[in-house]
Amino acid sequence: MAVSAVHLESDAFLVCMNHALSTEKEEVMGLCIGEVDTNRIVHIHSVIILRRSDKRKDRVEISPEQLSSAATEAERLAEMTGRPMRVVGWYHSHPHITVWPSHVDVRTQAMYQMMDQGFVGLIFSCFIEDKNTKTGRVLYTCFQSVQAQKGSEYERIEIPIHVVPHEAIGKVCLESAVELPRILCQEEQDTYRKIHSLTHLDPITKIHNGSVFTKNLCSQMSAVSGPLLQWLEDRLEQNRQSVIELQLEKERLTQELATM
């Protein structure tokens, strides 16, 4: 039986968006951590950004090792929060293409639902342009797979998704956001080392590959690390200002209490 709805907390939504917008050449993916209530509503509290072992323009996959690591992280969060946290879904990006899941996505989702009927899939379609306004858009959807009435194939069923606002970003989501630049850097290093280890490459090709590697790292610093650092600094300044305002409010209330 399909879930009735998905409630995605805004700080987890922020991490998903940052991850999806980190690259427009290949798809990215991650896992959703949360819980399912008695009304079959999936509550997503945080996400885990996965490291891609194979970069493809139109496909991403989850390895068993990554699922195991995510399950361990969910257990840690359950102990930390005292709530029944577990892996409740996965998300991936669709750069430059439609938000609707492909046949591969639907089959992959069906495979996960064999292990957990409450498992959901999220897709973030980015780097697309509205033809009328000529402005960029980001679309997102949530889906599950159901057996088609005719044949052995699966078809998607759209699940209502609601973004639940939060005044502040949670610790776990903040850690995931900070982890993103490191994971992207590791992916670039893995790709470079794999190519650089080939013995038949001539010196000019190796120099070219090194230049491409450096260029990609600089692009990541400009597009991901720089804006993330600026956002964290702005958030820190906002928190400091809030502390000052709360201290002034405390002093005012203390003075009023003393005059009573």
UniProtKB/Swiss-Prot annotation:
Pfam families, per database record: BRCC36_C (PF18110), JAB (PF01398)
SMART domains cross-referenced by the UniProt entry: JAB_MPN
Short motif JAMM motif, span: 92-105
Cofactor, free-text remark: Binds 1 zinc ion per subunit.
Annotated keywords: Cell cycle, Cell division, Chromatin regulator, Cytoplasm, Cytoskeleton, DNA damage, DNA repair, Hydrolase, Metal-binding, Metalloprotease, Mitosis, Nucleus, Protease, Ubl conjugation pathway, Zinc
EC primary class: hydrolase
Assembly, per entry: Component of the BRCA1-A complex, at least composed of brca1, bard1, uimc1/rap80, abraxas1, brcc3/brcc36, babam2 and babam1/nba1. In the BRCA1-A complex, interacts directly with abraxas1 and babam2. Component of the BRISC complex, at least composed of abraxas2, brcc3/brcc36, babam2 and babam1/nba1. Within the complex, interacts directly with abraxas2. Both the BRCA1-A complex and the BRISC complex bind polyubiquitin.
Summary of the function given for this chain in its UniProt record: Metalloprotease that specifically cleaves 'Lys-63'-linked polyubiquitin chains. Does not have activity toward 'Lys-48'-linked polyubiquitin chains. Component of the BRCA1-A complex, a complex that specifically recognizes 'Lys-63'-linked ubiquitinated histones H2A and H2AX at DNA lesions sites, leading to target the brca1-bard1 heterodimer to sites of DNA damage at double-strand breaks (DSBs). In the BRCA1-A complex, it specifically removes 'Lys-63'-linked ubiquitin on histones H2A and H2AX, antagonizing the rnf8-dependent ubiquitination at double-strand breaks (DSBs).
Protein name: Lys-63-specific deubiquitinase BRCC36
Species whose genome carries this gene: Salmo salar
